[in-house]
């Protein structure tokens, strides 16, 4: 009996021990996943969270890269017409769900967790780097909100992670007037600019102060001109037919649109000038084809196809690639084969000035006609001659050094399979490399690993010019200096007044002469014509 009792006692003790051990095990943090209490507590974790949230238009997939963003516009066409935009009665609600909050929630979560820890001194790491990564999150929230502003206008302003209670979600879904959303974006960009530097770990492959200021100028200019040119349409807060007027929660909302326009233009000028005054435009050697080597012949052309863009002053933010890490892209594969299934439109090509600064239709312009593309390009702005190609321009490389009998574009490849098709006859070679190792002349996908420009400093100069003229109805000394520098780089006479004097709207096919259906001032048109602030600014600066 004693023996039995002894075994029972030992069994109970062993069981108690196992239960205690089990409870201790269950109290442990999971070893295969990250938990809120253990993450976002040091510099490297902040860096990883921030860069994982990067979402920019870069080279990727089976296409020519960011250049395809201009497809379906008046500047660039693809084989499938964009009837949704341009044919009367065909406008449809997009399939893209712009009313989404996933990204905003993730960014708010970071700020909600990290800011208190940072202020309490609980984040491990170098203070400069900690501030950098917090600044990046503010930038990214502004970037996401700018997308919402462009797609939806009025939008809820959320700064905290919401509960899943229905009442809370309904309250948080109330849209704020678009000018308030724009001010919120500028506020986030101000915080980003204050926290970030222009020399972070990772260089300009990470966001910087200049990137924040550049985007701030873009957002502010966009909102100012939206308010100015769409006033009275019902799409501007305060309009009689503005939907917000019907909302009880906005019954006390007031706005002085003129003051708002002035505020945004002032902010755009200040932000743009800080960046514009710092940068040096990349040199244009005026060589339009490689002569002795696939590289080193024109820095301006090679700004879009070099492995390392870090030392280029004009490049504010860029994406690096590396074959050794299997981080490649397809840009040269498509552009060097003859088309990529897109091309510049005739209307866009017409906007490029002659070297003497005159429009093509002006007397004494030295325009050679358009019987052949190479004649149409003669005596033209070097941006057209460099980033498009005529029949006589080099198509691709087959060997190094440069062969004496090069492969040229010859006739436009308008009947090829889509990946090699030139849709309009005006072939685009921006962001194309002539290096064989990058895919020139080859039949293999994903050989390219040169960098991709995301933000260029020249945009700041353009934004300043436009904001200055919109605000003051004239150009100040800074705006004039920017304009002359851009024209000089393009090989165009820097005297912009002769261009303005020769401009005849009855001979212009460019949609950019209109805003909200009304012709704009000729100085404004010629200073910002066809400015495209997509990541590569493919259609940028053509007629200035």
Predicted regions and their residues:
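Bacterial N-terminal signal peptides
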Residues: 9-17
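C-terminal motif of bacterial Sec signal peptides marking the signal peptidase cleavage site
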Residues: 19-21
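An aromatic- and glycine-enriched ligand-binding surface/loop that stacks and positions planar moieties
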Residues: 23-83, 155, 159, 190-191, ...
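Conserved, well-structured interaction surfaces
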Residues: 35, 41-61, 78-152, 168-209, ...
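Acidic/serine-rich, low-complexity amphipathic helices located in mid- to C-terminal regulatory regions
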Residues: 146-150, 297-325, 522, 526-544
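Active/binding-pocket-proximal capping segment
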Residues: 402, 458-464, 474-513
